[in-house]
From Swiss-Prot:
NCBIfam families associated with the record: gatA
Any Gene Ontology CC annotation: glutamyl-tRNA(Gln) amidotransferase complex
Protein name: Glutamyl-tRNA(Gln) amidotransferase subunit A
Enzyme class: ligase
Complexes and interactors: Heterotrimer of A, B and C subunits.
Function, in words: Allows the formation of correctly charged Gln-tRNA(Gln) through the transamidation of misacylated Glu-tRNA(Gln) in organisms which lack glutaminyl-tRNA synthetase. The reaction takes place in the presence of glutamine and ATP through an activated gamma-phospho-Glu-tRNA(Gln).
Pfam family, one: Amidase
EC number from the UniProt entry: 6.3.5.7
Length: 491
């Protein structure tokens, strides 16, 4: 029998439909794989009893010829999504053993469509990080290794657990969130596919907030088709989220394999950075060549305000975080550290409950929102954000269908490798991805090649608002040309 954990989500769906195996067998295979791969630290909570119960229910539906599009398919859930009655901590000590009394909209839609929950996945604390090293549960290990080395590498962040689990065959797909690149960067580091949908496409209700005007939920999967299948269930209007957009959800899977002939692909000159590694430059050129061979037209474009995106992002995001994280005070839920009075209790709780990176970002955010600096920093960053959005609008108005860029400035680096470095060095990992968040646009990261040490590298496509379908069509061209990427099992 085929190793059930090596199947794509689409293959598993077809296998269940033609009764090659049961949902329970599929779920058990993944639960066993999770047990064998605990060294990766991808899961912070395993839910085997719940998973088996959901799988049995799926098998009953299959026997009756009923069930939704994800019936019996085992998924992992980033620990940022509220799961009713199941511990949700955002991988922070301050949320301690919090069990939400409600389910996030995105996960409730997955369960509505028949998916099975295997457990909660590790992430950077409150989704703040680019390496999954800030989690209270410890770092996630990338299933990929450099050739000839057993050094542990980061999977990227903040959705490192999601990316690592998908790459290692510990789930068929996973939920993730992207505030400045937290879906696309881990996908690029692990040889998986990650989609950050248009802002407002997927509900944010029930997702622990980092920066509300930037956060967006999306899937990480093994293939473009798998990501499209998950997107269909995750997307949709939600009246509980005021930023959710009421427009029909298209058949994303139908876009996979569609011709890209005649599409105009923008190649932004500002993304050619000083000191860019030659292999990233080569990968980008190669990806553009694949799209051209498929019938697309390449056009050099200008996004002149790109150079301001990263500094503006690191003003806007911490400002929103300092506001969102003000609610964690130890009064109603989560951890509480007593003090002589209520103010001291707040201070003790927040000092002990938040990790160093979260404290750093709260302090930056509070500083830029303070009376003396609001105009100089926050207001100016919001103006820059408008200019970044206009750069993209001008490109699309000129007939560009999507923009092709590298996904990351390098392949995965070692755990602890940047621990003593200036935090800005870590923030530079987001250099190619933050613009899509600042402009609210959809982006996809697709594996496109490997570096000299055998590690996966990804390319990014950024599209028009609510045109994820074009990204899926283009992404599949790159996927077909580059082939599938699977790490060699060492765990």
């Amino acid at each position: 029998m085929t190793d059930l954990t090596s199947l794509t989500l689409a293959e598993a769906r077809d296998g269940l439909a033609n009764k090659s195996f049961t949902a329970l067998e599929l779920t058990d295979a993944h639960l066993e794989a999770i047990e064998r791969a605990r060294v990766l630290n991808a899961y912070v909570l395993e839910t085997p009893a719940q998973a088996r119960a959901m799988a049995r229910e799926a098998d009953v539906r299959i026997a009756k010829g009923e069930g939704g599009p994800l019936n019996g398919l085992p998924l992992g859930v980033k620990d940022l999504f509220a799961t009713e009655g199941t511990r949700t901590t955002a991988c922070s000590q301050i949320l301690d053993d919090f069990k939400p009394p409600y389910e996030s909209t995105v996960t409730s839609q997955l369960w509505r469509d028949g998916a099975v929950m295997l457990g909660k996945l590790n992430n950077d604390e409150f989704a703040m990080g680019s390496s999954n090293e800030t989690s209270r549960f410890g770092p996630v290990v990338n299933p990929w290794r450099r050739q000839g080395s057993d050094a542990k590498l980061v999977p990227g962040g903040s959705s490192g657990g999601s990316a690592s689990a998908v790459a290692a065959g510990l789930c068929l797909g996973a939920t993730a969130t992207d505030t400045g690149g937290s879906i696309r960067q881990p996908a690029a580091f692990t040889g998986t596919v990650g989609i950050k949908p248009t802002y407002g496409r997927c509900s944010r209700w029930g997702i622990v907030a980092f920066a509300s005007s930037l956060d967006q939920a999306g899937p990480i999967a093994r293939t473009v088709r798998d990501a499209a299948i998950l997107m269909h269930s995750m997307a949709g209007h939600d009246p509980k989220d005021t930023t959710s957009v009421d427009r029909p959800v298209p058949d994303y899977e139908a876009a996979v394999g569609k011709s890209v002939k005649g599409m105009k692909i923008g190649i932004p000159k500002e993304y050619r950075l000083d000191g860019m590694p030659a292999e990233i430059e080569k990968l980008w050129t190669q990806g553009a060549g694949w799209l051209k061979s498929a019938g697309a037209e390449l056009v050099e474009v200008s996004l002149p305000h790109t150079k301001y995106a990263l500094p503006a992002y690191y003003i806007v995001a911490p400002a929103e975080a300092s506001s969102n994280l003000a609610r964690y005070d130890g009064v109603r839920y989560g951890a509480r550290v007593e003090g002589r009075n209520i103010v001291e209790m707040y201070e003790n709780t927040r000092a002990k409950g938040f990790g160093a990176e979260v404290r750093r970002r709260i302090m930056i955010g509070t500083y830029v929102l303070s009376a003396g600096y609001y105009d100089a920093y926050y207001l100016r960053a919001q103006k820059v954000r408008t200019l970044i959005k206009k750069d993209f609008e001008d490109c699309y108005a000129a007939g560009i269908d999507a923009i092709l860029t590298p996904a990351t400035p390098s392949a995965a680096f070692g755990i602890g490798e940047k621990a003593g470095a200036d935090p800005i060095e870590m923030y530079l990992n987001d250099i190619f991805t933050v613009t899509a968040n600042m402009a609210g646009l959809p982006g996809i990261a697709v594996p496109a090649g490997r570096d000299a040490q055998g590690l996966p590298l990804g390319l990014q496509l950024v599209g028009r608002p609510f045109d994820e379908e074009t990204l899926l069509s283009l992404g599949e061209v790159i996927e077909q040309a580059a082939g599938r990427f699977t790490p060699e099992r060492w765990w």
